[in-house]
Amino acid sequence: LIPAGDAPMRLLYQLYVFENWLYRVNMTGEQLRLWLEHATTNYTSASNPDYLGGGYYTDEIYGLYYEIHYYAPEGKRIQNMQYQGQPVAPDQVFSVVMNNYRFTGGAGFMQAAGLTPEDYSLTDMYTGDTLGNDNGQVRNILAQYIRDQKEITPTVESTWQFFRTKEDAIAAGAKVVE
């Protein structure tokens, strides 16, 4: 939690601890689905199978609505993907921003989506090039955004739902795909 008031740079180091840059990659709806399917494999803990929690490897895709039907077999857990209220077509192309850790293959997301890590033909923007090596780091981009905005009032927007059981999905009125 960041307290109200001035946000010194040290708070941004606490908020975003890694030295990352951003890449913009064009991905299809099917590649996004596979990416999210890979994330669903990280919702349990080996030491406690009843625990369904996140961590570093439970990626979300902001702006895309989707449902995680955890009870479904792997490969069929991501259902009802929509963008701007419309179903996502497998061949629909999206511009996706990811950090260099993901782009270079970190945690296997690129491979899971059928993409080759560090395939620079997939990207048309890298913040290290467009903003410079230091200014292009995520934490420095955040700092500049905060300076430009002067004041930030964070909001939370949920763009996905998680259903542990089929009964949970039905009770919520979700469209259950077998």
Segments from the language model and where they lie:
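Catalytic centers of hydrolytic enzymes
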Residues: 1-178
